[in-house]
Amino acid sequence: MDIIGGQHLRQMWDDLADVYGHKTALICESSSGVVNRYSYLELNQEINRTANLFYVLGIRKGDKVALHLDNCPEFIFCWFGLAKIGAIMVPINARLLREESTWILQNSQACLLVTSAQFYPMYQQIQQEDASELRHICLTDMALPADDGVSSFTQLKNQQPATLCYAPPLSTDDTAEILFTSGTTSRPKGVVITHYNLRFAGYYSAWQCALRDDDVYLTVMPAFHIDCQCTAAMAAFSAGATFVLVEKYSARAFWGQVQKYRATITECIPMMIRTLMVQPPSANDQQHRLREVMFYLNLSEQEKDAFCERFGVRLLTSYGMTETIVGIIGDRPGDKRRWPSIGRAGFCYEAEICDDHNRPLPAGEIGEICIKGVPGKTIFKEYFLNPKATAKVLEADGWLHTGDTGYRDEEGFFYFVDRRCNMIKRGGENVSCVELENIIATHPKIQDIVVVGIKDSIRDEAIKAFVVLNEGETLSEEEFFCFCEQNMAKFKVPSYLEIRKDLPRNCSGKIIRKNLK
């Protein structure tokens, strides 16, 4: 059964505006406390104006446009404005620095960038010094630098009509987004997401938390992440609910925001739960309307019980990754929950635990978590311009190898055991060990390097670097951490450094990481 019915994102927004009209669709709260509200009709008009803006700037169907933005209304306008004209959004993690952002620009073939003043100096350098197809920058801030190839997003948008000027033929199979995600290799891979993927994600995630049009879904997750886009935004809009997008997470402000907007659904990662628990207890801790808290790995039973008891909430566990688009294993609406299980396979999916030879394992045995979906529909289509990487994880019949290990019980409940090889989960961000090692290895004093994740009570894992220096060299912690801060995003910078004479290796010469944890 095709639950999408051939409807692409342009049709979705036109229908939503007709059906829900003046009902509140989007509320955005900035870090400074500025609140913007849009009805479904108003939001569709802003999306149309943004689509027309891109058309005026020469963007056509199939062109790629990068977004380097914090959570803001403009992200939503651009996301769906691009989709309406068949162009492709390339969201960039707002915490990435020049080298990482340049790589994504070059490998996505983005020809236009929408960003804010805080990130502009970095992209000005990229335009001047690095090879890329970037030919124009739109700044969301009102003040503009006196540079060629730069325009004001807001001024240009406000000059556009509220009806769509360019409407090329669209298919649900068309690419809507290329989302670069950290992998076990040295560089991120571009996950190709179609119109069908996003439409399906909306229906599926709305089903997962039994979302209704009178619900209010609040998130502090970054808009460039799949969680915000597919678990929250697409779910809320598909159900005709209200979507509340907060610019940045603050443990002190979170419950006040939940209460102020009368949120009924929200989503949390372990770092949020732990930081909320260290806030001073308040008589208002349970003064909210939350029905469900969508939760993503990984928390102890003691932490879960303490959080649920203090705040009077229950967690709805969901397991997935960028490639699966949604939480393909999770708790089901109205179904029993079995902590610490990550739940059962959702509708439209099959899940198996497989051995190293891709054979299904019986209940209780640990193996790789494998998921079967339909590429380009219920799971990602492919890695952008990377057929070799695609073939490594995605079989022709739709089986996806997650690289994560787990097991299932006799009733079909799945349990997560370990994260995919060489990945560190740090406060909601996936960090590739290999990527960090390649950067740190460029330091002239360092001969050998390995980074590992170690347990952290707040952020799941902290990053520790083990280095071997060149003969006769010395390296201070200050010099090392300064080098890292200059060459990688802040969330990737190691927290600890240990200088060693050598690193443990097996007979093949590979470093034995488990000996360093």
UniProtKB/Swiss-Prot annotation:
Keywords carried by this UniProt record: Ligase
Record keyword Repeat present: no
GO biological process entries: carnitine metabolic process; fatty acid metabolic process
Gene3D superfamilies in UniProt: 3.30.300.30, N-terminal domain of ligase-like
Catalytic activity, EC: 6.2.1.48
PANTHER family per the UniProt record, alphabetical: ACYL-COA SYNTHETASE, MEDIUM-CHAIN ACYL-COA LIGASE ACSF2, MITOCHONDRIAL
Function: Catalyzes the transfer of CoA to carnitine, generating the initial carnitinyl-CoA needed for the CaiB reaction cycle. Also has activity toward crotonobetaine and gamma-butyrobetaine.
Family that this chain belongs to: Belongs to the ATP-dependent AMP-binding enzyme family.
Name of the protein in its database record: Crotonobetaine/carnitine--CoA ligase
Species name: Escherichia coli O81 (strain ED1a)
